[in-house]
C-alpha cells in the first residue's frame, strides 16, 4: 500500500518520483535499520515509558536523516555509480536530478532535522553536530579507507546517546555499550550489502570491508554479530533488563545464523537478502525491550 501510494506520484509527477528515488523513501529498509536501535535507546532511557515528544522527535528524525544520508551518498558517488550494476540508474547518474538540486535537498532535510532537535535540550543539540559530521563524511570514506562501514556504524548509532540526553538529560556510561553494539552490528550487515557490489568495486577501486575481508567475510560478519550480542547482554545487565530482553537477543541470534547459512555461496541475491533480513533482528531486540518493561 505504501509503495503503491508512492508510485501513484510517478504518474502524477515523474519529477517527484525522481526525488523519492534519490531519498530512498520507496525503500524503507534503511529507515528500519536506523529506527530499531534508536528506539532501543529511547525505550531504555525512558524505562519503558518514554515521553511521546521524544518518540515523535526521534522517529521523524530517523526518517529525515536517513533520507539526507541517501542524498549525500548519491552526490558523493555520482561519478562511480554508473559503473556499478545496482546503482547505474540512480537519479544523479541518469541526470534526472542535478548535483545542485541534491545539495539543496540535503540542506533542507538536515535543516528540518535540526528543527526537531531544537525541541530537546542543549546536550542533545550539541551531540547532533557530531551526528551530522558522521552522516556527511561517510559517503566519502570509500575513497580513502577500507572501513567506510565503521563510519556508517558510528553514524547509524549516534541517535542512541542523543536519545538518552533528550529523554533524561544525562548520558550514562552503559549507553555506550548500546552504541558499540549497534556499530558492530551495522558493520556486519553493511558488509553483506557491500558483498553485493564487491566485483564491481574491485574493478573501479572502491574500498569496503567486503573487499578487505575477502573470503573471510562471512566468518568476520558472524563474529561482529556475536560481539554485538555480547555488548547488548552487558548493557542489559547494566540497565537491569530481564528475560524478555534476552529472548529478543536469542531471536536476533537466530536471524544471524540464518544469514550466515543462506550466504554460503556468496550469491548477490542471497547477500542482499541477508542484509535486508537484519531488520528482523533489530525488531526482535526492540520487542524484547518493550515486552520486558511491559511485564514489570
UniProtKB/Swiss-Prot annotation:
Record carries keyword Membrane: yes
Domain of life, source organism: Bacteria
Keyword Protein biosynthesis: no
Reactions catalysed: all-trans-octaprenyl diphosphate + 4-hydroxybenzoate = 4-hydroxy-3-(all-trans-octaprenyl)benzoate + diphosphate
Residues that span the membrane, as ranges: 29-49, 52-72, 102-122, 146-166, 169-189, 219-239, 241-261, 275-295
CDD domains reported in the protein's UniProt record: PT_UbiA_COQ2
Membrane topology, record value: Multi-pass membrane protein
EC number: 2.5.1.39
Any Gene Ontology biological process: ubiquinone biosynthetic process
Annotated GO CC locations: plasma membrane
The protein's required cofactors: Mg(2+)
Cellular localization per UniProt: Cell inner membrane
Family: Belongs to the UbiA prenyltransferase family.
Name under which the protein is recorded: 4-hydroxybenzoate octaprenyltransferase
Biological source species: Pseudomonas syringae pv. syringae (strain B728a)
Amino acid at each position: 500500500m505504501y509503495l503503491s501510494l508512492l508510485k501513484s506520484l510517478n504518474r502524477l509527477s515523474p519529477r517527484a518520483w525522481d526525488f523519492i528515488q534519490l531519498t530512498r523513501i520507496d525503500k524503507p529498509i534503511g529507515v528500519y535499520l536506523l529506527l530499531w536501535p534508536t528506539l532501543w535507546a529511547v525505550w531504555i532511557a525512558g524505562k519503558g515509558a518514554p515521553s511521546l515528544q521524544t518518540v515523535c522527535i526521534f522517529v521523524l528524525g530517523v526518517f529525515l536523516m536517513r533520507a539526507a544520508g541517501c542524498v549525500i551518498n548519491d552526490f558523493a558517488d555520482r561519478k562511480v555509480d554508473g559503473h556499478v550494476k545496482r546503482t547505474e540508474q540512480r537519479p544523479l547518474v541518469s541526470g534526472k536530478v542535478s548535483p545542485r538540486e541534491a545539495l539543496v535537498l540535503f540542506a533542507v532535510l538536515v535543516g528540518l532535522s535540526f528543527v526537531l532537535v531544537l525541541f530537546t535540550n542543549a546536550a542533545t543539540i550539541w551531540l547532533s553536530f557530531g551526528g551530522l559530521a558522521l552522516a556527511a563524511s561517510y559517503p566519502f570514506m570509500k575513497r580513502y579507507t577500507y572501513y567506510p562501514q565503521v563510519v556508517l556504524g558510528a553514524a547509524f548509532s549516534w541517535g542512541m546517546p542523543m536519545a538518552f540526553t533528550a529523554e533524561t538529560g544525562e548520558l550514562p556510561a552503559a549507553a555506550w555499550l548500546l552504541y558499540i553494539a549497534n556499530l558492530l552490528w551495522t558493520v556486519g550487515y553493511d558488509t553483506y550489502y557491500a558483498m553485493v557490489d564487491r566485483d564491481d568495486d574491485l574493478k573501479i577501486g572502491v574500498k569496503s570491508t567486503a573487499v578487505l575481508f575477502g573470503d573471510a567475510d562471512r566468518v568476520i560478519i558472524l563474529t561482529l554479530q556475536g560481539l554485538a550480542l555480547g555488548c547488548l547482554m552487558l548493557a542489559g545487565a547494566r540497565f537491569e533488563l530481564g528475560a524478555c530482553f534476552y529472548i529478543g537477543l536469542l531471536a536476533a541470534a537466530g536471524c544471524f545464523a540464518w544469514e550466515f547459512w543462506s550466504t554460503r555461496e556468496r550469491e548477490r541475491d542471497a547477500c542482499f537478502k541477508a542484509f535486508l533480513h537484519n531488520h528482523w533482528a533489530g525488531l526482535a531486540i526492540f520487542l524484547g525491550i518493550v515486552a520486558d518493561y511491559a511485564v514489570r
